[in-house]
Amino acid sequence: NVDRLIKSPAWQKGRDFSIILRCFYEAGYAVEWRVINAADYGEAQRRRRTFLFAFRNDTALFRKAADLICVEGLKGAHQLLLQDGFFAPIFPLYGFERKYSEGWLDEFRYLDLKDLSAAQSCHFYTSGLMVNGRFYSVESIPLQFPYKPLCSVLEITPLAERYFLSAADIDHWRYLKGAKQETRHRRNGSTYFFSEGSMAFPDRSDLPARTMLTSEGSVSRSTHVVADPRTQRLRTLTPIECERLNGFPDDWTAGMPERLRYFTMGNALVVPLVKAMGKRISALTEDEQRS
């Protein structure tokens, strides 16, 4: 899910994620989570997503985690997050910040989900673990790998004219990407003051791309604009380039309307990350069968 999942809603931080963890607890599962930026692990897009790995309380993996936490307490939970848990072997960490939270979400702390929803508020961090209704969360620092720059996914063949910005459109794009401090009008006639900072225009091709949204390719502030490597003219990304940013093969979405190709990639996960997790789950499943 999106990275803000662990913080929502704004007026009761952590409530929604607490509900998710409590539901897993009631279903007999432990949960480890990590907020991962794909660019930190060598990908071409700064795409942050919250990944949850749940494991049932009748597995050897659960018993190992529960035993360690029972003996070592929060130090044991910390060890699992930084070294021995689900994510650390495939997405290693450099360390952690001195920010953490811990507590209980079980029936002794909250009678039921209604009770939890009304009262629970907590600051969850980018790494965390919930076992037997007890959670521990810490702000982790990723061990950063060399990233792929945006220029590495750009097509170098001649492209259709529809991807290029016309001279008449440049000023409008500059406005969309630029800083704003202006009075705007609501539908009911009232006014409000709108402010936002500037964005790079065009996008820097020596850095990973920003997070793609489902509106990628449309005329919007969030759409990437690059200097074409062949002509140096400004243009938007092509569907193939969007597929590459997520680690899909070229033309993976071919055959659907172009608008939906952009929409699909704006909703997608970064494939190499999911592939690494799939291999990790497969290895843990084999270990479970041998235990």
Protein language model features and the residues they cover:
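Class I S-adenosyl-L-methionine
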Residues: 1-199
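C-terminal target-recognition/interaction regions appended to catalytic cores
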Residues: 123-291
